[in-house]
């Protein structure tokens, strides 16, 4: 049952800007069990498949453009790679510290409140000056730096990248696309690196399937909420979750 619940939590919260890693740690604490970072990463592979299906048209377009040696798609792919590098560096260099944070509900609560602040600010950022193809490399790096902070439980990956993209002037629909696309290498890499740490069971595989299905639902919801200017709802939720975690866990 625990694996099933964690699968649902991972699927829904991976793309909603409320921090999937933070919620996995919270529910693990509620179950009074030790955080299984390996299983958490395994669930990331499920949401990797969900986002790959959700943005399959964009991925196919980029791959086709690269094979045809079209400059705009080569540049876009290069920017996505650049956006990924900071998170990879942080994950490899500070993996042990990050894993230890999963056991600190106080820090998770603090980080959730930071995510909440970013979400409240995001709804007021609507410059619509840039598209996914027109952002400069410097912007791609900045968005990547924001994503790097999301390795900490309680800091939302989708929340930080959406905030950064909107702050830098990207239109809302393209900000969502860019956030989803740049999540692919990070979630895939994290899942593959941690696979060696888990022993597969039928319950964990079922949790994987549930995480995949709920991930598709989460993708649809976050796209609708961002375009509709309703990110503040997630901000208020993060504050409530932060209060609960700090006071009662």
Curated annotation (Swiss-Prot):
It is an enzyme of class 3 (hydrolase). Its EC number is 3.6.1.27. Its main location: membrane. GO terms for molecular function: undecaprenyl-diphosphatase activity. The chain crosses the membrane at residues 11-31, 35-55, 80-100, 101-121, 135-155, 175-195, 202-222, 226-246. It is a multi-pass membrane protein. The keyword Acetylation does not apply. It is found in: Cell membrane. Keywords: Cell membrane, Hydrolase, Membrane, Transmembrane, Transmembrane helix. It catalyses: di-trans,octa-cis-undecaprenyl diphosphate + H2O = di-trans,octa-cis-undecaprenyl phosphate + phosphate + H(+). InterPro entries: UppP. It holds the Pfam family BacA. GO terms for cellular component: plasma membrane. PANTHER family: UNDECAPRENYL-DIPHOSPHATASE (PTHR30622:SF4). Catalyzes the dephosphorylation of undecaprenyl diphosphate (UPP). Belongs to the UppP family. This is Undecaprenyl-diphosphatase. The lineage of its organism: Archaea, Methanobacteriati, Methanobacteriota, Methanomada group, Methanococci.
